[in-house]
Amino acid sequence: MPADDPGAANGSDGGAVSGVPTGPKLITTRFDQADGYTYDGYVRSGGYEALRRALTAMTPDAVHDQVKTSEIQGRGGAGFPAGVKWGFLPDGVFPRYIVVNGDESEPGTYKDRMLMELDPHQLIEGVVLASYAVGAAQAFLYVRGEMALAQERIAQALNDAYANNLVGTNILGTDFSVDIHLSWGAGAYIVGEETALIESLEGERGMPRLKPPFFPAAKGLYLQPTIVNNVETLSNLPWIINHSGQDFYDLASPTSTGMRMFAVSGHVNAPGVFEVPNGTTTFRDLVEAPEYCGGVRNGRSVKAFIPGGASAIWFFPEHLDLPLDKATVDQAGSMLGSGAIVVMDDTTDMVAACWRVVRFFARESCGKCTPCREGTTWLERILKRMLDGNGRPEDLATLVDVCESISPGLAWPPKQTTICPLGPSAVSPIVSAVERFRHEFDHYVEHGRPIDGVERHAIHGTSGVAVHV
Amino acid sequence: MSRLSDHHVIVANDIIARCPRPKSALIPVLHLAQEQDGYVSTDAMEHIAELIGITPAEVYGTASFYEMFKFEPVGKYCINVCTNISCQLLGAWELLEHAEERLGIKSGSTTTDGMFTIEDVECIAACTEAPALQVNYRYRYRVTNEDFDALVDDLRNGALDDEIPPHGTLARVRQTTPDNWADTGRRAQEAVDAR
């Protein structure tokens, strides 16, 4: 049981032995540096050079242009190009805000926490660069409530950055000023949805706002123009400014640019977080290559895998050779989402796996929209009674029917009867598992137990949260 | 049980002053109350309402939405076992079962001596380190049953006091308001609000 010491991400540069695509580390370079999270450690390894360069030698538009040229796609889940998003800000409307989404909670996702714990100054530098580019005088850094170490490291980094005139009034002697205010949540997955995050920042219950407006760039925090960016997205900005948007664009495929962090968990020999060439690396590379996960545990085979977080449609062995490319994965009927790959081997009980993901959404539904609040709860109950051996012959049809009410047509990308995508996300695991492993559900209903040869879990918890209303 | 201490009022007012609108300070200030008492008391919520200039009902309305806020005392150590998909695949339920047996309580409850609370929680962003848990939001990775037993022993005999503060304390480093706080965002927003 290693102590509270996040493992280092493994880069793909150097020592490639199996012909996987390689590239430089952009944002994980300090993960192996013992003092990489401190001000001194950051500056010693080239930190804040991009900020100095931008503020003294580049106009805000020039910084924005570099980000546009890089075509960096947002790393939070939707994959929307950051430079385009910034362009949605209405001209001449101030104040405007930058909000950093550090509410990493999508099951399978583990990379923003690493970036916040191990390189907080890199994120802060990215926030100041973004604020300069769009003309924001205040930025909010919202960290997930459960991440105590990330909050500590960022608080210390902000105090040091202020003391060294890298944030605050007249940064580095220029006439640019911006404040960064550290805030944090208190346990609610839905706050990762950007309008819910804004509600939470305003001190409200974290419920998504009705759309339109579709982008907070029009009306966001305090109904002012607001850009919400993910931690990983902003952490890339110092590299882009130190090199160029074109350099970033040239690293990988034209439809998924730059390097990107992926967390691979589940039934692999060496689970880990890897910064790899985006768009050219394949799922199989990550799962099988010795420099990454080194294959499925115990020499077994892949039964299914989640390609982009719990909200994604599942993939199967025939998808392993797809590249980690947004356009390709979208076209294949799922998404790369938040860079979270969960591998399930051939001993996995698919009904149990499906139930666990659905339980997550049922528990995290904010309750604002009826189809999601009621629907996810019923989906969870039906799946749980199957697992408990009390499944009914009509249950499978009921599951699909409830799914239809949340996401009509069960298409991808999902249609929704809800304000935000949380409800439809609970449909993904059911559509995936029922379509492919219908016999496993039928077997549960008929025999009250899983098919032979799958691992059983000691599932017994309900919603075991202490003394909560 | 109590209102915020004088010290916590100073910290709270500092946070409130940094926000363009006072209510934005609500969640961080609720955490202060939980840090003081280990949970969020009714008195503290009334006090927070006064400090921010909203009603106690608004404070409770927000607080009750978020899972981390407790409205009754919990254990000195809250042990949160992740059972989400990556952890389930690698034995989280078995770990939770062991934790319940070892402490003699069910998930969601607290030992009679007030030392430990167990919760089964959703993904804590440590998926590659499954099965994972948090003690008062400090991580433990790839936890075996033996690891769990050693953890409980260490918590009981104080060996982890430096690393793991009592429940309620999150970050032990706070952002301070420096002399060069620009305050342009707040002033601009106040001008907008005044229109």
Regions found by a protein language model. Give the residues of each.
Chain A
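Histidine-anchored nucleotide/phosphate-binding helix
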Residues: 119-133
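Short amphipathic, charge-patterned alpha-helical segments
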Residues: 126-130, 279-297
